[in-house]
């Protein structure tokens, strides 16, 4: 899950949330999003040329869509829009499977969130180094 905070100009990595029944989760002022269906392709086994994931609100919100980007070589730490005319964008950090997600709500409000997306890669079939990566629970 991703956690977002309003009004941040820069983001620092958040620690992984622990799923303990005794740990209360505050929802007032926080937005909690679930990331699923992560997939990506590394044509040379070292860099991504496509990334895709689903993002969904978990606090009775309406957010539920697929975010994706494709290029000859997707650059780490560069923000890519989730779609045409979208207020949402993401950046990826390959070395730690880190997702940085940003939603520009207004001139004064930006939600920023981070998550680590565990995944596994297998042979892709488009060459000896081509791999396809998918999210792992």
From Swiss-Prot:
* UniProt subcellular location: Secreted
Please provide one cellular component term from the Gene Ontology annotations of this protein.
extracellular region
Signal sequence span is 1-18
What sequence ranges are listed for the domain AA1-like? 28-137
Hydrolase keyword on record: no
Give the principal location in a single coarse category: secreted
Q: Which keywords appear in this protein's UniProt record, sorted alphabetically?
A: Allergen, Disulfide bond, Secreted, Signal
Q: Pfam families under this entry?
A: AltA1
Q: Fetch the InterPro entries from UniProt.
A: AltA1 (IPR032382)
Keyword Secreted included in the entry's annotation: yes
| S-S bonds | 67-82, 121-133
Q: Which family does it belong to?
A: Belongs to the ALTA1 family.
Miscellaneous comment as given in the Swiss-Prot or TrEMBL entry:
On the 2D-gel the determined pI of this protein is: 4.0, its MW is: 17 kDa.
State whether it acts alone or in a complex, and with which partners, per the record. Homodimer; disulfide-linked.
Q: What is this protein called?
A: Allergen Ste b 1
User: What species is given as this protein's source?
Assistant: Stemphylium botryosum (Black stalk rot fungus)
């Amino acid at each position: 899950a991703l956690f977002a905070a309003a009004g941040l100009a820069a983001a620092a990595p958040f620690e992984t949330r622990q799923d303990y029944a005794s740990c209360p989760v505050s929802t007032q002022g926080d937005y909690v999003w679930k990331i699923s269906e992560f997939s990506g392709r590394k044509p040379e086994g070292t860099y991504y040329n496509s990334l895709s994931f689903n993002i969904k609100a978990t606090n009775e919100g309406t957010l539920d869509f697929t975010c994706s980007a494709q290029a000859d070589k997707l650059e780490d730490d560069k923000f890519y829009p989730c779609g045409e005319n979208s207020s949402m964008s993401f950046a990826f950090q390959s070395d730690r499977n880190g997702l940085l997600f940003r939603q520009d709500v207004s001139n004064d409000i930006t939600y920023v969130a981070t998550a680590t997306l565990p995944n596994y890669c297998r042979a892709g079939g488009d060459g000896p180094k081509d791999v396809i990566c998918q999210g792992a629970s």
